[in-house]
């Protein structure tokens, strides 16, 4: 019988995916999420299974992966398991990952545009820009490598011609940051329709980050809702 704590964590992965679709920052089976099994950075993680609608996923369907890339569950892990694995390996500060194909973040990613500090909330992502990675085919090691590069010193990035990634100490905060990035992408896109935005200087973003908590995980948790699907 599955321990209650493990079942609850697996269910939290499902609930996170349902919320990201309900919030409109993802659709269909395109996104995915993962969370560390324990606070220990050497621990494995739980990740959404591949190609199952979120509302059909049960705790038993969530896949447990080890940091060596192995998994023993019956289901196949998300097709994007490689970048989840590599982020968990290389970022001990990361406790959870949310990957979405939000409309505005993906629009900018298709233009291969980073999001500059046109608004002070950019500091939530850990620096003066939200970078856009290079392009690589989904599910490949090349995509994982370029995502890691774009996330260096950051907690979120866009994936060229693909979507976005947000990380956090837990699923609640990773999802909140993903929502913040989508909101910023929408505001930036709208600003560009009118004119050229005024970009805040790096030292102002540093000050804002310090006020958030030494560039810490300060994203307001706006994430709520349910229903949706998995990649």
Kindly label every feature range from the protein language model.
Residues 1-231:
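Glycine-rich flexible loops
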